[in-house]
Amino acid sequence: MKLNKEENFSEWFDTVLRESGLYDYGRYPVKGMGVWPPFGFKLRKLVLNIIRDLLDSTGHEEVLFPVLIPKTLLEKESEHIRGFEGEVFWVTKGGHEDLDVPLALRPTSETAISYMESFWISSYKQLPMKLYQIVPVYRYETKATRPLIRLREVSTFKEAHTAHESFEGADSQCAEAIEIYKKVFDRLGIPYMISQRPPWDKFAGALYTVAFDTVMPDGRVLQIGTVHHLGQNFSVPFEVRFHTEDGDKDYVWQTSYGLSDRVIASLVAVHGDERGLVLPPEVAPVQVVIVPIPQKEEEQQRKVLEEAKRVEEELKARGWRTVLDDRDELTPGAKYYEWELKGVPFRIEIGKKEVEGDELTVARRDLKKRVKVKKGEIHQRLKEMSDDMLNNMRERAWSFMKSRIKRVRSLEEAKELVEKRYVVELPWCGSKECGLRVDEEVGRVLGVPLDEDAEAKGERCAVCGREAKWWIRVAKTY
């Protein structure tokens, strides 16, 4: 595999997913639905471990809701159903009989969870309630589907749902969710822009939506996480009320925030190279592969394999996910190719020199170079190199993303740069009319930056020429 991801990202991405064994897409006989083979499932599990750890440590509790939602529930919040109705899969028959009420395959769970919270919540003492689940969701995508990026079955959807006593409590929860997501992406080395989506592009039923976006190798932007302040838009129709400390009754204030398969899509796309995957050690299904170098003499070959097994046992005992590749039908070069494609962070090569000396030869996936490590220091050095590798991957990814963001002051400049797959920031007066014109003529408005100073002091709106209030981000998106 020698594909350039910047020149032909789509082919590169599909090839890496398939040949690495990460995700099998396009062969299962339902459009927009793929299969996680064992290698990909292990990666998925390790990424979810990070997410679960960060949610559990901040007081979230995991739940599991049914996949079917009655149409009567979805219709209770009118703006919500308008936003999703065209994307819903409906179950209308049970066996040979028509159902009295059509059932939706869960597109998201605000309605289902609000319904149950109306039974569960009665007092301010139960608040905040912070729940999450990791489940498949279903969207009838009519656009071209893409593996892990645009699917009809989003098999890995982490949705958190919280309930609070006040607007401010929910607002603070949104801030906490943003910090959690920053930690998730930082541990994966994925760069991100944080923007408040414009009012016409917020989540259906939310007061406001904050989104995390990253820049893919082809310059298009991928939304990788969202945080929504729902206000009381769901608690009122679903009667989610509680007794306040003063003895009154009030409706809870809610938030929801989600991550999906796109986290893994961005992990693959941002870090991979012409040889395949490049994975951060924390989430690599195999962290270390040991490759014995074949020897002509039988006794020397035996010693090489013994040393390889000794190193394997030591590393496994220390907690490293380690594979000894002692297949004799493959050359070392063929093994290097296969394990590089799978993104294994470290390869230890053991031959005659390593048997007779006190050093091991270690190849690091992100740098494509070999280093010598003393045998007694292998565990500590791998720990140090793991930290250095993540930092290197993170810095390289952030550098690329920042190089794709340009600040301009006219629609003409913006159009030209967006066509060249840059993210542009341009001054905006704040009016919906001007924002929609940018949407139509330039690219999708991502929103007002929250990760930098977004006030456009002294600037003029790029559309109407009036005094600008904010800088807004615009890009071509998936």
From Swiss-Prot:
Q: Which GO terms describe its cellular component?
A: aminoacyl-tRNA synthetase multienzyme complex; cytoplasm
What the entry lists under SUPFAM superfamilies is as follows:
C-terminal domain of ProRS, Class II aaRS ABD-related, Class II aaRS and biotin synthetases
Supply one GO BP term: prolyl-tRNA aminoacylation
Q: Which GO molecular-function terms appear in the entry? A: ATP binding; proline-tRNA ligase activity
Kind of enzyme, top EC level?
ligase
UniProt lists the family membership as follows: Belongs to the class-II aminoacyl-tRNA synthetase family. ProS type 3 subfamily.
Its name, as the record gives it, is Proline--tRNA ligase
Q: Which organism is it from?
A: Ignicoccus hospitalis (strain KIN4/I / DSM 18386 / JCM 14125)
Q: Which gene encodes it?
A: proS
